[in-house]
């Protein structure tokens, strides 16, 4: 697109901006090693990182268990503005999309029920509308989104920048976290059951 825009400008035309969405493993967004940082630098020279969306943990279930994110770029527009300041990037935490895993079926869309027990609107449609609204407004909502000025040396994930909304945590959340941690310790062989218990 860089060459195309140079040609357009030489003809007195406006440069063309193209949007590109790409799905990548989280490691590409987290990575700050020399190889990934260099690739990020090259990307940002002529392109703007508009947004990064952290996707559900098992979005490709049952085919793959890789954790992924979606990066949205504007090609042909450097991430640095002409005045040398960095453009802002929207980060969306899109982990809960309203789908559930079902054995032999994969991820299945869920529907809300009305007071009569009839299925109504798709939970996904409600969640999608909220996510699109947050992105379009570049709104910052604790636990859901963040807006930051990042460069090649930074992490490109919402989790690094968003604030947690602790008002929504419950005793069940705490217990579930403790149970998960204990099962991890047992699995790794760090906790043994003895005569008196664990």
Predicted feature residues:
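A conserved structural/catalytic subdomain of Rossmann-like adenosyl-cofactor enzymes
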Residues: 1-198
